[in-house]
């Protein structure tokens, strides 16, 4: 089974669009909603960006849990950036969110990169060496797992395999080729792999993308807004049917 998600439109002055998109998606059957964690959209410091946790908390407090076999709805970050706030603060934010949606919070974590470094620098927030940021990420991931939360670590690099294994986390990749997903999901480590990326613009490509990811072993396909929730849910059903028919093993099995 492949679950579906959307990344909410939070590069706005108000949360209205994010709330509307979330309620539409969840009512249609999308499994989860996610938020970016940026001070501004990449390369656009003059544009607004809403913080993820207030948005997710408001939704978690107002949306009822479902009783279907798919569980949900899930609320997560894609991804929360280690280093923007101290680890203990980020841990507290996730634990607080989990009080509103027990068992349904996904702590997507990342270290940031050269594209997001300017956000730190603009506000005087240290941007440590990559190894230091990765160490902080694994430390936080372990603490979150200790609290019973689901954790995704961002990055498709081979080094992230060891980090995910050390933390007991899944691996999440952004706009990666299904071949990379398959390599990570069906390798000797048998990691859980989730996928996020922009929604295809061409008609018919959404279903093809979701089906390819399901065949590769991805357990989630999360698309940036805008994406048609009804088409996304239909694509996941088609992918599940196709995977069941082909007898493809699930990742980690």
Briefly describe each language-model feature range.
Residues 1-253:
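Active-site-adjacent structural elements that line small-molecule/cofactor binding pockets in enzymes
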């Amino acid at each position: 089974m492949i679950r579906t998600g959307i990344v909410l439109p939070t590069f706005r002055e108000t949360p209205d669009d994010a709330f509307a998109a979330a309620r539409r998606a969840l009512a249609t059957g999308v499994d989860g909603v996610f938020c970016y964690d940026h001070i501004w959209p990449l390369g656009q410091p003059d544009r607004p960006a809403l913080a993820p946790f207030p948005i997710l908390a408001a939704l978690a407090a107002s949306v009822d849990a479902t009783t279907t076999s798919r569980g949900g709805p899930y609320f997560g970050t894609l991804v929360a950036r280690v280093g923007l706030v101290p680890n203990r603060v980020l841990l507290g934010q996730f634990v607080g969110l989990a009080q509103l949606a027990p068992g349904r919070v996904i702590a997507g974590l990342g270290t940031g990169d050269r594209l997001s470094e300017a956000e730190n620098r603009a506000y005087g927030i240290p941007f440590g060496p990559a190894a230091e940021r990765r160490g902080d990420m694994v430390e936080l991931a372990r603490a979150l797992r200790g609290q019973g939360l689901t954790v995704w670590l961002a990055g498709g690099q081979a080094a992230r395999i060891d980090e995910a294994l050390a933390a007991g986390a899944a691996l999440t990749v952004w706009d990666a080729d299904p071949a990379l997903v398959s390599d990570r999901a069906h390798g000797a480590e048998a990691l859980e792999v989730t996928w996020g990326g922009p929604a295809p613009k061409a008609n018919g490509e959404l279903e093809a993308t979701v089906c390819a990811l399901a065949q590769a072993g991805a357990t989630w396909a999360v698309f940036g807004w805008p994406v048609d929730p009804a088409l996304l849910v239909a694509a996941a059903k088609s992918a599940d049917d196709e995977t069941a028919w082909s007898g493809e093993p699930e990742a980690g099995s």
